[in-house]
Amino acid sequence: NTLEGFSRLRKLGIPLDESEIKEMQISAVAYLDKMIVNQKKKNPDKNLSYEDICYLYVRSSYRDIPLAGETLDLHKKMVEKLRYWVNLSTIEKAYAATALYRYGFVEDAKDILKSLRQYAVSQPAKGMYWPNNRSHYYYNNSAVQEQCALFNAFSEIEPVTSELDAMRQWLLSQKQTNDWGAVPSTLEAIYALLEGGTDWLAPDENKTSIVWGGQEMKNSPEEPFLGLTEYTLSGNEISAAA
């Protein structure tokens, strides 16, 4: 989560202390590389596990940190296995598509998105989502986290504004009726709302306006887009409706 969070902050253009952060990233990535090699030596399974796919997904954000030796050899074999994605779960397909796209397997990534579109549901009230989009390998994932993984894949590989907006609409519908769950789910949902699709926070000619007693109520300058805006009128300013 930490490495993925740093990569998202960089993508959003958030200023970071690059020297200190980069040192942390290099150490964390080196640890992941070492762990995956050790695991594969102990359990040389022919198939990729959910954790393997997550590793490739996160590692693909740090292609500027080189691989070498047995780590590089293993990595190449794992990426090649990732191209056989048909039996993966929905979230695994999302991670696989993103990783393959970053590693240059563009057509494979687009094929995965084509398959995912076939299973998507679009409704005016809910937007675009995938029913039962829960990993059968990793029960801790919430539907919100999986929706965000799908959103990120579509946003990076084939960004269609109408689809991205519909996927964000589903996220907002979950917030209206429940909540986004634990902290990771909430962070991922906020990132999705900020990262792709129509800029819903941009001021434009179609912004919402409130008119009260013939006077337009202005947004608070301190909170132009988010937060609570209060309007107070004294008794003599209020008259009975005609």
Model-flagged regions — what are they?
Residues N1-P15:
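A conserved hydrophobic secondary-structure block that centers on an alpha-helix together
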Residues S19-K22, I26-I36, K40-K46, Y50-A242:
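Long, domain-scale non-catalytic interaction/scaffolding regions in large secretory-pathway
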